[in-house]
Amino acid sequence: MKLKILLHSSTNTPSFDFEEQQLPGPSTPTYTELTQASPCGRGKSRESQPTSTTSPETSGLRVRRGRRQRKSGPGPGETPSKRRRGGGRGGGETRLESAPSPGEVGIRHRTVERQGLSRLGQLQAEARDPPMILLKGTANSLKCWRYRKQNSSNCGFLFMSTVWNWVGDVSENHSRMLIAFKSPGQRDSFVKHNLFPKLCTYTYGSLNSL
């Protein structure tokens, strides 16, 4: 409290006027102090100033990462736009046993069937000689078996020879017979669907010509 005394000079009786004015002191807080001390004031001051955690360096890194992901192409979960050709259609190609060696290459007397063969398969089949089967057994069993196969409607082979034997061979199963086929696939099918005579053995082979 501040006391202001005004003195008026007069001839008769001096008079005193008292004027009271409230001034800020240590006991009376000001408006600015109340605003800073109150929690509401803190919330307002914080809300008025927006904060940002991203810096220019981090934003630059994000832009670079986005460009790298675009250049890298589709991820593992995405389907690529182009697919490899081949293998999508039904039906498998006829597989050959193996590529012909230089000793197996010869001249064939018949054209190779192109159905079910790729370009590589055709070249390998054309390079091979006519596939054959050599039967070994007794003369009677081979003759009877040949007679039945020649009279059947579905023979499944190209040519079949007569029963013959090597000169000087006196073994029990000394008789031989040759069966020629168009392709290795036909030969495999013949072996799969036909029974050979009892105690008869066979082996694969090929000839330059028939």
From Swiss-Prot:
Q: Where is the composition biased (Polar residues)?
A: 24-38
The UniProt keywords, alphabetically, are: Host nucleus
Low complexity bias locations: 48-61
**Gene Ontology CC:** host cell nucleus
Against InterPro entries, the record matches this protein to:
E2/EBNA1_C_sf, Nucleotide-bd_a/b_plait_sf, Papillomavirus_E2_C
GO-annotated molecular function: DNA binding; DNA-binding transcription factor activity
Give the highest taxon in the source lineage: Viruses
Locate the region Disordered.
Answer: 1-119
Q: Where in the cell is it found?
A: Host nucleus
Pfam families per record: PPV_E2_C
Q: Which GO terms describe its biological process?
A: regulation of DNA replication
Composition-biased stretches (Basic residues): 62-71
Functional note: Plays a role in limiting the replication of viral DNA in keratinocytes. Recruits the host NCoR/SMRT complex to viral replication foci to mediate repression of both viral replication and transcription.
Family in the record: Belongs to the papillomaviridae E8^E2C protein family.
**Could you tell me what this protein is called?**
Protein E8^E2C
Annotated organism of origin: Human papillomavirus 65
